[in-house]
Amino acid sequence: MSPQTETKAGVGFKAGVKEYKLTYYTPEYETKDTDILAAFRVTPQPGVPPEERGDAVAAESSTGTWTTVWTDGLTSLDRYKGRCYHIEPVPGEEDQFIAYVAYPLDLFEEGSVTNMFTSIVGNVFGFKALRALRLEDLRIPVAYVKTFQGPPHGIQVERDKLNKYGRPLLGCTIKPKLGLSAKNYGRAVYECLRGGLDFTKDDENVNSQPFMRWRDRFLFCAEAIYKSQAETGEIKGHYLNATAGTCEEMIKRAVFARELGVPIVMHDYLTGGFTANTSLSHYCRDNGLLLHIHRAMHAVIDRQKNHGMHFRVLAKALRMSGGDHIHSGTVVGKLEGERDITLGFVDLLRDDYIEQDRSRGIYFTQDWVSLPGVLPVASRGIHVWHMPALTEIFGDDSVLQFGGGTLGHPWGNAPGAVANRVALEACVKARNEGRDLAAEGGEIIREACKWSP
C-alpha cells in the first residue's frame, strides 16, 4: 500500500454514532445577520428531552447524518452546520416546544426557493424520533433576499398599469368552475367586467380540459376584456391560468397571453412547483405581464396545527419566488386571534419591514429591502354584506374576490358585479369621510342600495 493511502490503526478518523447535542445544540451561539433563522414547533416522542430533538432537527436539515463519516474531516462542519440555539415551551402544550435553528447562508443556492425548502423542510419531517414537526416561521436575511427577483411588478407598478388608486381591486371567479364552453365562459367574463369588476378569474381547476381547451378560452376571454374596456373606459383583466403539465407548455401559454395583449396570467404555485413559478415570474417581468397566484393544495401543508408548515412561510416563499397577487383567505367571521394571525402574514406580503410580533404569529423581524410587495386576495364565501368589514380589515392594497357573491345575484352576473362595485365605492367613501365601517356598515350598504341603479 502506498504511503498516500495507508491508514494507521488508532490515528485520525474514529467511527461511531455521536449524540446530536454534542455538535448541533449550541445555546451560546449568537446569530448572524446572514443566517437563515427557523422556528420549528417540535412534538417529540415520549420521554425524549427537548434539546435532544431540537439538535436533531438542526442536524437532519443541514450537515448531519445518523453516524460519523470519515468525509467529515474534509470540510468545516462548524462553518456549514445548522445550530439549535434556543428552545422554549409552547404555552398550554405540555408535549410541544419551539426550537430555533440558525442555518449558515452558504448552505443555500442563490435565488432558489426549491433548494431552500429541500434542506429546511426535507427529510427531517419524516424523522422517527419526532411525533410531529411544524415550521412556524423563517427569517430570510437581506443577503439572501437580494438574490431573488421577487414579484414580477409589485403593488405600485400594478396600480400604475391599471390606473386604479385609492381602493381595493374587485375580482370574481367564474362559476361553474368546470363544464362551460369557451364561448359561454367568455360571456360570463364580459358580463362581470362590464358590470364594474376589475378582474375575473379562471378557477384553479381550469387548465386545458376536453370541454374547454386553453387556447379557445384565452381567445374568448381576450374578446371579453377588450369589449368591456371599450364600453367602460377602464382597464380590465382576466386571470388566464397558464398552469400546465410541463414548464415548456406553461411558458407557451403565457407567450400566447402576451401576444393577445392581456394584462395578467395565473399560476397554481404549489401544485405547479416553485421552480416553475419562478420561471413564470421571470417571464412575466420581462414581458410586462402581471402574475396572479393561487394556493391550491396549501391546506395539505398548513392545516394541521402541529405538523407541516404555517402559511406565513408559504407566503414568504411566494414573495421570493414571484407573484403579484396571492390568495390569503378572509378573516370575516373568524375568531379575533385568527384575524391577528392572518393580518400578520398579510403584512409580510405587502410591507417592506415587519417587526417581530408573536401575538400576530411573527417570530422574526423581516426586512424585505427593495423586494416588491404582493397584493393579498381575500376570497372564500364572501358577499356584498361583507364589504364594510373587508374594506376596513384589508385596506386599499388588496383584491376582494367574489365568486358566488357576484354570479349568485338573483338578477344575473352583471347586476351582481354592479352590486359589488357600488358597495365597495360606498364603503370607501364612508371610510374617507370618517364613518365607522364596523358600526355603520349595514346602514352604509342599505343607503347604497337605495340610490344604486
UniProtKB/Swiss-Prot annotation:
The keyword Oxidoreductase applies. It is found in: Plastid, Chloroplast. It comes from the Eukaryota. The modification N6-carboxylysine is found at residue 201. GO terms for cellular component: chloroplast. Binds 1 Mg(2+) ion per subunit. Pfam families: RuBisCO_large, RuBisCO_large_N. Substrate binds at residues 123, 173, 177, 295, 327, 379. One of its GO terms (biological process) is photorespiration. The modification N-acetylproline is found at residue 3. Residues 1-2 form a propeptide. InterPro entries: RuBisCO, RuBisCo_large_chain_AS, RuBisCO_lsu_C, RuBisCO_lsu_C_sf, RuBisCO_lsu_fd_N, RuBisCO_lsu_N_sf, RuBisCO_lsuI. The record marks 334 as: Transition state stabilizer. The modification N6,N6,N6-trimethyllysine is found at residue 14. Keywords: Acetylation, Calvin cycle, Carbon dioxide fixation, Chloroplast, Disulfide bond, Lyase, Magnesium, Metal-binding, Methylation, Monooxygenase, Oxidoreductase, Photorespiration, Photosynthesis, Plastid. The disulfide bond which can form in the large chain dimeric partners within the hexadecamer appears to be associated with oxidative stress and protein turnover. NCBIfam families: PRK04208.1. Heterohexadecamer of 8 large chains and 8 small chains; disulfide-linked. The disulfide link is formed within the large subunit homodimers. Belongs to the RuBisCO large chain family. Type I subfamily. The basic functional RuBisCO is composed of a large chain homodimer in a 'head-to-tail' conformation. In form I RuBisCO this homodimer is arranged in a barrel-like tetramer with the small subunits forming a tetrameric 'cap' on each end of the 'barrel'. PANTHER family: RIBULOSE BISPHOSPHATE CARBOXYLASE, RIBULOSE BISPHOSPHATE CARBOXYLASE LARGE CHAIN. RuBisCO catalyzes two reactions: the carboxylation of D-ribulose 1,5-bisphosphate, the primary event in carbon dioxide fixation, as well as the oxidative fragmentation of the pentose substrate in the photorespiration process. Both reactions occur simultaneously and in competition at the same active site. This is Ribulose bisphosphate carboxylase large chain. The gene is rbcL.
